[in-house]
A protein has these predicted regions:
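N-terminal glycine-rich FAD/FM-binding segment characteristic of electron-transfer flavoproteins
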Residues: 1-159
């Protein structure tokens, strides 16, 4: 799994730490001011993609190309499961990215695994377990999982 976190002017959205932790510390920061963000002890590997101001269609196009052509040198770990924080920009970017990748989208997940996605429905009164049969894109609710601590400075790559 890999987290994709939309960034505006070096500001991380709510749910960033949850998404990074869910993806074992592997994260792609995309947007403006990504070079100014320090994820020491919060991530294992960080890929920086400075695409400037928010343009969802352009971001989705660039990210899909990166994910589709990725190997472990560019993006560490598996890119079969792409996780975004369920924040405003994440909710906008996720469907555009899922469409570009030709993958299903699971919005508002409360927990993720390689073979299952738990989503809240009916105003949070119901929890549904879904079993994806392949690669997918999901948004993860903020505050559900919490942060994880990774020792030291992450490995940082610029694309």
């Amino acid at each position: 799994m890999i987290a994709v976190v939309p960034v505006r002017e070096s500001v991380l959205p709510a749910g960033t730490d949850d998404a990074i932790a869910e993806c074992d510390g592997n994260v792609v920061l995309v947007g403006s001011g990504v070079d100014d963000i320090d994820l020491t002890d919060r991530a294992r590997t960080v890929t920086l993609v400075d695409l400037g101001d928010v343009e969802i269609a352009r971001w989705a196009r660039h990210l899909a190309a990166l994910i589709n052509s990725a190997d472990d040198v560019v993006l560490p770990g598996s890119t079969d499961q792409v996780v975004l924080p369920h924040c405003p920009d994440g909710r906008d970017l996720a469907p555009a990215l899922a469409l570009r990748l030709s993958r299903p989208l699971y919005a508002g997940a409360t927990a993720l695994a390689h073979d299952s996605v738990f989503v809240a429905r009916s105003g949070g009164r119901e929890l549904h377990e879904l079993r994806p049969s392949g690669a997918f894109v999901a948004t993860l609710q903020p505050g559900i999982r919490g942060a994880a601590s990774f020792d030291g400075h992450p490995e940082v790559r610029r694309v």
